[in-house]
Amino acid sequence: MVNASGDPVIEAAHIWSDTLTVLKHSASLSPREKGWLEGVVPEGVFGSTIVLCVDNNDTLQAIQGDLNDSLLQALRTVTGENMFPAFKVVPKTEPEPLSEAKPAQPYPSEISPTVAEFGKESYGAKPAAAPREPMPATEPQFPVGQQKMNRDPETHLNKNFTFDSFVPGDSNRFARTVALAVAEGSGQDFNPLCIYGGSGLGKTHLLNAIGNYALVKDPGLKVRYVTSEEFTNEFIDALQNPNQSQGQIAEFNRRYRQVDVLLIDDIQFLGGKEATLDQFFHTFNALHQANKRIVIASDVAPKNLKGFEARLISRFESGLTVDVKPPDLETRIAILRMIASMNGSKIPSDVLDLIAERFTENIRELEGALTRVTAVASLSNQPVTRALAEQTLQDFFTTDVEIKPTDIISQVAKYFHLTFEDLVGKSRTKNVAVPRQIAMYLAREMTSMSLMDIGQVFGGRDHTTVMHACTRISDRMQQKQEIYNYVMELTVRLKQSNTN
């Protein structure tokens, strides 16, 4: 889901991407003025302030001068409220430091316009002047973006997720021990290994750690990490061309049945997808009979998986099933210390205690809260204290209301003077087809549903129809102002209706 994490870095990236698009479509700005905006890099959102980095004072003066009013208006259009930019001058160095840590346009055309939920606290009610000196090199930088982007193109493993960076506690120690045994190749009795638990508790971390460790022990191994949606999409892609499907399916089978270690995440999303499950069943059997290692992660225990045949569930249960639970207080504090240590940040113990006491559900909450506190301290040039943390996090406890696909369909239908049935029905007339595509696009960007699940909501349409709709609207938003405006206004309405 877009902005589901509430992380200030990710929120800033989404907001700036949309703001830049608004400004590029502005007829009142000259090409030169639009050019000044290309080098701006978003750093974070704190209250009603968005921190933007520029690489020289000329750019800063241009944006704070002639472009200031246009920028404020664009931010208001995107977020639905008054936001104020604070600027930092961060000169470019050679070689450039980890460009993936602060992408200029992290999600260019695929992300729909978003409206973040901000607190009332503002850190800088007016556009702030740039600091006279660049921020020190020790400024805390949390690797949220890097973790998402540091993915090996062949194995799909995230190199940042290792056993060394996994903090054990009573809630996950047994799962870690078993995972390490599988990674070492000594856990044949645990094959397959099924790890289950709620979101943000470390399942994905463990899967990647297994793959990374296995490759350290034996670089010649063929390891592949894949989510269930990626597996589904690859299988469907292999079926697309009737003239070549046999060859493509054979290639798909080779790709997965020749691996030594298969790590599949979020297996629950395969539920009810009969053709994909049948393909996975045969892949599973081929690997298991060849004594290859299989590790599966799910949000529920195998016996509770919905839409799976008994024959597949029995195979999952033939190995070992372990769970991960929400971390206890001591483990949460240890996790926060690990995060701070990995980023060279010195955080007082009472601040770590405060965050650990307030955020109890999962690790993502902990990381997001710590990131927000350290970023606000850096921006305001203050030390990290318990008082600052209390103030910063006071609006962090509001739970975002998840937007349902039916809410999106209803809102889009109302906006275009159609009915719910029009959008989920079979009509292909232009006055229905375009709103339907917009609704599919919004469902993809504002919910956590897979393409196939979205298709089911829209009258049982298939994966490719939804994919085409999302691509079509994404492209047309860059070409037609009215399409962009439709998506923007609907996004604002959906956010407002779900927070009232």
Curated annotation (Swiss-Prot):
- Predominantly, its location class is cytoplasm
Record Gene3D superfamilies? 1.10.1750.10, 1.10.8.60, P-loop containing nucleotide triphosphate hydrolases
Domain free text: Domain I is involved in oligomerization and binding regulators, domain II is flexibile and of varying length in different bacteria, domain III forms the AAA+ region, while domain IV binds dsDNA.
Against InterPro entries, the record matches this protein to: AAA+_ATPase, Chromosome_initiator_DnaA, Chromosome_initiator_DnaA-like, Chromosome_initiator_DnaA_CS, DnaA_C, DnaA_dom, P-loop_NTPase, Trp_repressor/repl_initiator
Q: Which GO terms describe its cellular component?
A: cytoplasm; plasma membrane
User: Superkingdom, according to UniProt?
Assistant: Bacteria
The record's comment on protein family reads: Belongs to the DnaA family.
- In residue numbers, the region (Domain III, AAA+ region) covers 156-377
Region named Domain IV, binds dsDNA: 378-500
Which residues hold ATP? 200, 202-204
Spans annotated as Domain II: 81-155
Q: Where in the cell is it found?
A: Cytoplasm
What does the UniProt function comment say about this protein?
Plays an essential role in the initiation and regulation of chromosomal replication. ATP-DnaA binds to the origin of replication (oriC) to initiate formation of the DNA replication initiation complex once per cell cycle. Binds the DnaA box (a 9 base pair repeat at the origin) and separates the double-stranded (ds)DNA. Forms a right-handed helical filament on oriC DNA; dsDNA binds to the exterior of the filament while single-stranded (ss)DNA is stabiized in the filament's interior.
Gene Ontology MF terms in the entry: ATP binding; ATP hydrolysis activity; DNA replication origin binding; lipid binding
Quaternary state and partners of this protein? Oligomerizes as a right-handed, spiral filament on DNA at oriC.
Q: This chain belongs to which protein, by name?
A: Chromosomal replication initiator protein DnaA
What keywords is this UniProt entry annotated with?
Answer: ATP-binding, Cytoplasm, DNA replication, DNA-binding, Lipid-binding, Nucleotide-binding
Q: Which Pfam families does this entry report, sorted A to Z?
A: Bac_DnaA, Bac_DnaA_C
